[in-house]
Design a protein with these regions (language model features):
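Rhodanese-like catalytic fold shared by cysteine-dependent sulfurtransferases
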Residues: 1-77, 87-120, 129-171
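Short cysteine clusters
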Residues: 125
Length: 171
């Protein structure tokens, strides 16, 4: 306090608890300082409206969640897995219960017309890239993709026996 008087300050007050106690009470340490309210980041939902567990990347499904369902043969009825590969590749092996719609040469509207209605759609391919492309094609064309997702994974199937390695999220 004496130093402040020597510097010319006139209205000097001493807080008995000292600075550590002052800070503990979350009180400002300068006249201009105001407590900053932290802005909460918008919470991303964990599940889709129908109950599919969402991945970290936009449009993705949680890969480990879906992999476990596929391996345990417990993919829910509300989910339709859509293999986007050419029919020739699909016939070599695919995820049990999946259907094949080769999306590469189709427009977004043509893809949607072939998708089952009232289902959560999950696109898959052999490495993730073509399923992402199919999803992006729909999104770019303004299609509602709130229940359409992609499975970002390396998938190698012989008949219905599949080895699945989930790719790391980009986020």
């Amino acid at each position: 306090a004496d130093k402040l008087y020597k510097l010319g300050y006139k209205n000097v007050v001493v807080y008995a608890g000292g600075l550590p106690e002052w800070k503990k009470q979350s009180l400002p340490t300068t006249a201009g300082a105001k407590k900053v309210d932290t802005v909460k980041k918008e919470q991303k939902p964990e599940f889709s409206k129908n109950g599919a567990k969402l991945g970290k990347d936009e449009g993705s499904i949680d890969g480990e969640w879906l992999k476990a369902l596929i391996i345990d043969n417990k993919v829910p009825e509300y989910i339709q897995i859509v293999n986007v590969l050419p029919a020739k590749e699909f016939k070599k092996g695919n995820i049990k219960g999946s259907i094949n719609i080769e999306t590469d040469k189709l427009s977004a509207k043509e893809i949607v017309s072939k998708l089952p209605k009232n289902k959560t759609i999950i696109f898959n391919c052999s490495a993730g890239a073509r399923s992402i492309e199919a999803w992006m094609k729909l999104k770019k064309d303004g299609i509602d993709v709130s229940e359409i997702f992609y499975f970002d994974a390396n998938i190698n199937c012989k008949d219905n026996n599949c080895k699945i390695e989930v790719n790391e999220p980009l986020e």
